[in-house]
Regions:
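A structural signal for multi-pass alpha-helical bundles of membrane permease subunits
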Residues: 4, 8-283
Length: 283
């Protein structure tokens, strides 16, 4: 290797290491704070290693009794989040796989125009849609229920449609033609040929839906009124005292428990995730 190439590679690696440490520091601070006594959470200068490791903060987070809101039903929030996330993931995979297939492999009048309009919806900021969407769901009588949070997933999302459409286009059309010669219809071709080959892209769409729903705060904040219907991200607000005295170590322990499923899912599915992202833009 030439000296300048070696120097450039070393510089890039050092920059990547520094950025990785910078991104990891907040997570490390959250983990260490979740194990600290309450007196060490706000010390100056900050104390990274707790003098005493308190694993008891995690049971306290699960069975927390808030001064303002009373007992915090962590398990109820967890069940609500799991149910809601499951519905959104199912709706996302079901609807977007069908729409993406139509845009990628079927020919019909106005296909490219409709696809362009679908992509254009990604340019609309969420705050612009927030008020009219809330008015629509209020007119339907859905405010205060989970339906505004999961029903839209069954009508497709522009990003997942684009992702799946791009992946479908990488699958050889000769496979579909051969299946048609054997008497297969479009739906059977979709189920038995395209879907098995598109598992990496479908997994990516499911992962994005999972992470987006699990971490969603604004949606539940707008539509959920009863504390018994709160999700985990919204329920974390109950750990904060409005009059001072927030137990930050308990709050950080609860936050660690909330993000743990997302970290585990991404850790075990990262190979498929990267494969789906990398192969969706080949063609």
């Amino acid at each position: 290797l030439k000296p300048q190439n070696t120097t450039a590679k070393i510089a890039v690696q050092i920059a990547l290491i520094v950025l990785s440490v910078m991104f990891f520091l907040p997570l490390l601070w959250m983990i260490t704070t979740s194990l600290k006594p309450i007196g060490e959470t706000m010390t100056t200068p900050p104390r990274w290693i707790p003098s005493q490791i308190l694993w008891s903060n995690y049971p306290k987070a699960i069975f927390y009794d808030s001064k303002e809101l009373g007992y915090v039903p962590f398990f109820v929030y967890a069940v609500n989040t799991v149910v809601l996330t499951g519905l959104v993931v199912a709706g996302t995979v079901f609807s977007n796989s069908l729409v993406g297939y139509a845009f990628a492999r079927l020919k019909f009048p106005g296909r490219d125009l409709f696809f362009a309009i679908t992509l254009a919806t990604m340019m609309i900021p969420f705050p612009v849609m927030m008020v009219p969407t809330f008015a629509l769901f209020k007119w339907l009588g859905w405010v205060g229920t989970f339906r505004p949070l999961w029903v839209p997933s069954f009508f497709g999302s522009a990003f997942s449609i684009f992702l799946l459409r791009q992946f479908y286009r990488t699958i050889p059309f000769e496979l579909s033609e051969a299946a048609k010669l054997d008497g297969c219809g479009e739906f059977r071709i979709f189920l038995e040929i395209v879907v098995p080959l598109a598992r990496p892209a479908l997994t990516v769409a499911a992962l994005f839906a999972f992470m987006g729903t699990w971490n969603d705060f604004m949606g539940p904040l707008i539509y959920l009124m009863d504390q018994r219907t709160f999700t985990l991200s919204l329920g974390l607000a109950a750990y904060q005292s409005q009059h001072g005295g927030t137990l930050w170590n308990v709050l950080m322990a609860a936050t660690c428990l909330v993000i743990l499923p997302v970290v585990l899912v991404f850790f075990f599915a990262q190979k498929v995730f990267i494969q789906g992202i990398a192969t969706s833009g080949i063609k």
